């Protein structure tokens, strides 16, 4: 590899710009291509990292000790994988950096995220996950990263890659508000429209537990109007900081996860907070964020609280 493309385990305090996790899978390659566009858009460096785990070996006798240390072997395999990313970015003219790092992929990316603007990963890697199930890295990383994480799904299409809006889910929580301002900055950078969305749950599921609960179209419409008014106030606040940004608001009624998944198919980016108004505050992703990541039709950015 050239000096520009060399692997490194030092200099972790440098600005990493757009950080992409690469394990050689097709979705990781898709994440690298997405990362190149993002780095070019942000006018920052693109850093691709391949992690490798150090094996714990027990040898019964001296004769069974391999001539090449297992950790050196693991590092060489990672460097070999990383050459695929180098080839993918052969024609990329922006500043780029490639490195290997010891440790599990999620842990490495979480640590490096402290020095990155954004981390990008594929929804699944080579861990054997199939169907609509997130890989372990794309599940753990958004919940612990120090910067926003973008997860690129297999079903992501190019139809809305540049023309669709940036959509952000707003729920009135502090986390949701941070996500809203992050989405506004992202939309401004992309020259895209920003759509603020509050999903109002239909409420039918409560009727089993509260059969005397009165649910009517009038009640729903009244609450929808209240939420719309609140959303328009948030939009007005954003307009003061982003005067050139085109803003729209919507308050659809339905299941939050299903509604946001449907919206993701026409958005160039869907932005979520790690956790919303749920009462359980933990190191886990909120149920809506986790559900959207599992089923999304387009790239999703998760903003840390």
PLM features: residue spans?
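Conserved N-terminal glycine/acidic-rich loop preference
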Residues: 118, 196, 224-231, 267-276
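Small/aliphatic-rich secondary-structure junction motif
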Residues: 2-66, 164-217, 239-241, 246-250
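Short, structured interface segments
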Residues: 138-157
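A short acidic, glycine-rich active-site loop
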Residues: 66-80, 215-229
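Structural beta-alpha unit
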Residues: 1-14, 27, 56, 69-72, ...
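Short beta-strand elements of ligand-binding domains
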Residues: 122-123, 149-154, 300-304
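Glycine-rich, Arg-bearing micro-motifs that act as flexible, cationic patches
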Residues: 121-140, 163, 269-295
């Amino acid at each position: 590899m050239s000096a520009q493309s060399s692997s490194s385990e030092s200099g972790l305090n440098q600005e990493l710009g757009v950080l992409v996790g690469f394990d050689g899978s097709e979705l990781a390659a898709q994440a690298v291509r997405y990362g190149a566009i993002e780095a070019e858009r942000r006018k920052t460096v693109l850093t691709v990292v391949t992690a490798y785990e150090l094996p714990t070996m027990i040898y019964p006798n001296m004769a069974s000790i391999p001539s090449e240390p297992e950790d050196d072997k693991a590092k060489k395999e990672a460097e070999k994988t990383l050459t695929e990313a180098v080839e993918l970015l052969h024609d990329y003219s922006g500043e780029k950096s490639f490195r290997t790092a010891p440790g599990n992929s999620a842990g490495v990316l979480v640590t490096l995220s402290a020095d990155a603007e954004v981390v990008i990963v594929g929804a699944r890697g080579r861990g054997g996950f199939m169907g609509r199930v997130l890989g372990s890295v794309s599940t753990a990383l958004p919940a612990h990263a120090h910067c926003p994480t973008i997860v690129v799904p297999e079903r992501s299409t190019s139809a809305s890659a540049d023309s669709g809006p940036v959509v952000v889910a707003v729920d009135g929580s502090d986390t949701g508000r941070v996500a809203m301002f992050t989405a506004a900055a992202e939309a401004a950078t992309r020259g895209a429209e920003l759509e603020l969305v509050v999903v109002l749950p239909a409420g039918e599921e409560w009727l089993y537990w509260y059969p005397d609960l009165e649910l009517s179209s009038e009640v729903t419409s009244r609450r929808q109007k209240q939420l719309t008014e609140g959303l328009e106030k948030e939009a007005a606040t954003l307009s003061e900081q982003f005067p050139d940004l085109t803003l729209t608001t919507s308050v659809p009624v339905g299941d939050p996860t299903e509604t946001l998944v449907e919206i993701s198919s026409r958005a160039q980016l869907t932005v979520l907070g790690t956790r919303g108004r749920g009462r359980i505050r933990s190191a886990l992703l909120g149920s809506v964020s986790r559900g959207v990541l599992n089923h999304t039709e387009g790239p999703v950015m998760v903003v840390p609280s």
